[in-house]
């Protein structure tokens, strides 16, 4: 089974339509790591596709704690719960937002210039520390 976070959002809903054997993860807003583990065990999840984020830069700047929870801590919970599951996380091309020259850029050449981008970069690093083969998709805003 594939667990899709943000199953009612723009990207998540498209994934739910395209992929077989998917379930939408309930809201992660008040979930703890144990709640995610229970969902994964109940549905025998083998893949997690994480699409949820607070992506409005202005909202992130005004509410850094909420941004950190949504954009860093929740993905870390998913990584810890994903012991035997493949984890795919949507990140952002904003990690390159401080670059002076136009891309393309290498994966290691990052320069975030706003709190959203900083949180996305921290998410990538922390998740990969937990799940080394996790996939990070640095998508443009959609």
At which residue positions do the language-model features occur?
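Rossmann-fold NAD(P)-dependent oxidoreductase module
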Residues: 14, 18, 81, 126
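Catalytic helix-loop patch of NAD(P)-dependent Rossmann-fold dehydrogenases
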Residues: 69, 73-74, 95-137, 141-142
